[in-house]
Each structure stands twice: as structure tokens, then as C-alpha cells.
A protein has these predicted regions:
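Preference for extracellular/luminal or secreted protein segments
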Residues: 1-166
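A generic structural micro-environment signature
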Residues: 8-9, 13-15, 138, 142, ...
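Extracytoplasmic/secreted proteins, especially bacterial periplasmic and envelope-associated proteins
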Residues: 25, 73, 117, 121, ...
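Residue-level signal for functionally critical sites in structured catalytic/ligand-binding pockets
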Residues: 133-135, 159-160, 180, 224, ...
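Short, conserved catalytic-motif segment at the N-terminal edge
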Residues: 162-224
Length: 231
């Protein structure tokens, strides 16, 4: 499918339907990873909007309102010619009956909210920097049944340099972690460093006990109830 999106395809439009002040955050987050032009829709200029969108290779339609019926004909026509992805930052109850508008869509993403965290997360999901496993809980008329949905895995690597950090400096953490195991300060550990919410360093070392041969892995779970006491 179209998701996660290829970031090297520069000719992308983000068509925003809803209050213009709401869409800047999603677009800014997306722009960190790929070229994309933001266009705020106006129902009084659909003809010129259609002509403008035709020059793009793909279109992301972000929806912040349930009142977008005026655009559905134009979007259906556009989706027949190029990949169109719908992203809803509105309540699920407002999209129950929108299935007909989605039949030609390359992808439909339900964010359910226009909060800042949700908009950033959805942008990251769309380029493979976060995973998504959610399923719809109700039927969307003529489109999807309850429990349906597509799992999206994280496919993009985080480069420290993209966040103002130096990989060569972070690599020295390996030596410190291994030295601690050698000195029997601990049998194993996982070191995770987040910068602006991005895991710029995430490595595992050693085992769970000195007698145990089971290695520490990124999928292991930890009880961090007393984390504040040790940091």
C-alpha cells in the first residue's frame, strides 16, 4: 500500500479541510521527513483547487471537520488519477457514514482527535517512524467492518544527526555498558536515549542474571515503578 510513505518522493500535497490554524502542526511534523506543500481548502474555489492538485504525485487529505461534503466529488475524481490518503483528526462518530468517499482512497487513517500529540504521532506513522496496530470498533458504511484495519510496522531508522546528536559520541555508550557487565555491576541492561521523542540510541547488552543465558532484548518488559528513586 501507500503507507508507510516513501520520503524520497518530493511532489506531495497536504490538503487541509477545516480550520487553517489546526493543520500547521501535522504539516510541520511531516516536513521533518519529506517534502510536502500545505494547501488549505476553500469550498468557493474547488475548480482552481482541483487544477492545482493535479500537478502533485500524491495527496494527503487532512480533515478537521465533519462538514466536507462539498469536496467529496472532487476528491473521488482526484483519487481515480493519483494516490490519495485521507487522515481524519475528528471524532469517529463523524466518519461512520463516509465509506463511499473512501472507496478509491489509497489509505484511510483515523486519528480521532486533533490534539498535538496525535497529530505528531500520525505524521510519524505515515512515514514509518512509528507503528500502528489499531482496529476500527464499528462498521463504516460500505467500507469496513468492526475489527478491521492494517498493522503498520516501524520501518525507518532514527539517525542521531537528524536530531542534533553525534553517532560517534553515542557509540561510546557501548564501551561503558560492556565495562559495567565485565565489572559485574549488572548482568545486562538496555540503554534507551530519546531526543524530542525519537529513539536515537536503543541497544541491549548482556543477560538477565549472571547464571541465565537469555539475552536482554528490546521486547523485554520492565517494572519501572521506582525509576524516580534511581535517577
Amino acid at each position: 500500500g501507500i503507507l508507510p510513505m516513501a520520503v524520497d518522493l518530493k511532489n506531495t500535497a497536504v490538503l487541509q479541510i477545516g480550520k487553517s490554524s489546526q493543520g500547521a502542526l501535522f504539516h510541520q511534523q511531516l516536513k521533518k521527513y519529506m517534502g510536502a506543500d500545505r494547501i488549505v481548502a476553500n469550498p468557493d474555489s474547488i475548480a482552481s483547487l482541483t487544477k492545482r492538485l493535479m500537478k502533485y504525485d500524491r495527496v494527503i487529505v487532512t480533515i478537521y471537520t465533519e462538514k466536507y461534503a462539498a469536496y467529496q466529488g472532487m476528491l473521488s475524481s482526484l483519487a481515480a488519477k493519483k494516490p490519495v490518503a485521507y487522515v481524519y483528526f475528528t471524532l469517529l462518530k463523524n466518519v461512520y457514514k463516509k465509506g463511499n468517499a473512501w472507496k478509491k482512497a489509497a489509505a484511510v487513517v483515523l486519528g480521532h482527535s486533533d490534539s498535538e500529540d496525535v497529530q505528531r504521532f500520525v505524521a510519524d506513522v505515515m512515514v514509518g517512524r512509528e507503528k500502528a496496530t489499531g482496529k476500527i470498533s464499528v462498521e463504516v458504511k460500505d467500507y469496513r467492518l468492526p475489527g478491521e484495519g492494517v498493522d503498520l510496522e516501524q520501518t525507518k531508522e532514527y539517525r542521531p544527526e537528524d536530531y542534533g546528536m553525534d553517532s560517534s559520541v553515542l557509540s561510546k555508550i557501548d564501551e561503558v555498558a560492556l565495562e559495567g557487565i565485565k565489572a559485574k555491576a549488572y548482568p545486562g541492561c538496555q540503554v534507551l536515549i530519546l531526543k524530542d521523542g525519537a529513539p536515537v540510541y536503543d541497544k541491549c547488552f548482556g543477560t538477565f542474571t549472571y547464571e541465565d543465558e537469555r539475552k536482554v532484548t528490546p521486547d523485554d518488559l520492565y517494572d519501572i515503578a521506582s525509576l524516580t528513586k534511581t535517577t
